[in-house]
Amino acid sequence: LFRPPERFTLETTARINPAANTKLSGLYLSNGVFCTQCEAQGFRRITWYLDRPDVLARFRVRLEGPQAMLPVLLSNGNPISRGTFGDGWHYATWEDPYPKPAYLFALVAGDLAVRRDHWRTRSGRAVELAIYTEPAFIDQTAHAMESLKRAMRWDEDRFGLEYDLDVYNIVAVGDFNFGAMENKGLNIFNTA
């Protein structure tokens, strides 16, 4: 495409091997959980992209996997569809309506336990809150949930900022290269 129109949609297909990715950068598989770490330039380990903080795009992500092995399928943004297909497979489609740089892209898929709650914004909009972790750590997430709600209240009180997505997910996993990554709508933390 040597002379693309001013506006167009580009769709790509990439083949990667997350199980062989031992750098914990990009998309990797560790202890049965698929996870991403895209800062600072990890997204380019997933697919070709202009991986710079000044290049912003909206992302729509469809995750597919065997439901027995990967019952949780998460990405940034709002869930827009879920379903099943084939013999024991399922999918989840996520759409982030706000442009963001690639280093804030996030994806997690695995067999994780969850603690759920909700938040009502100052304007009355409901936000679903969820903290996912390996089952052995789920009892340690109550404080994290209360901290999340206090932080959301602080943002509203201090800056007048309401959270603008329908869900806010946090994932804590054992094998995460950074201490934390504050991807919008899907924060990822190390359990250590």
Model features per residue range: what roles?
Residues 28-33, 43:
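Intramembrane catalytic core of multi-pass membrane enzymes that act on lipidic substrates
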